Amino acid sequence: MVGGMPALTHEQQQQAAERIQTLMTQGMSSGEAIAQVAAEIRASHRGEQIRVAFDEADDDEASQ
């Protein structure tokens, strides 16, 4: 899978994780919370994207 992702600092990643946890404690499902925070991050980081590639074949080999 290849996708454009904003480059986040460790502090920004921590804030995102805390925001997800807050939304979940308010009754939102984990998937909904992650999607909402991802949308918020994308909206606030226009033009600061890096390309990230995930090689799923390596994951399959490591689990065997």
Swiss-Prot record:
The cysteines covalently paired via disulfide bonds are: none
Pfam families per UniProt: UPF0181 (PF03701)
User: What domain of life does the UniProt record list for this protein's source?
Assistant: Bacteria
HAMAP family tied to this protein: UPF0181 (MF_00507)
The UniProt family comment states: Belongs to the UPF0181 family.
Descriptive protein name = UPF0181 protein NT01EI_1861
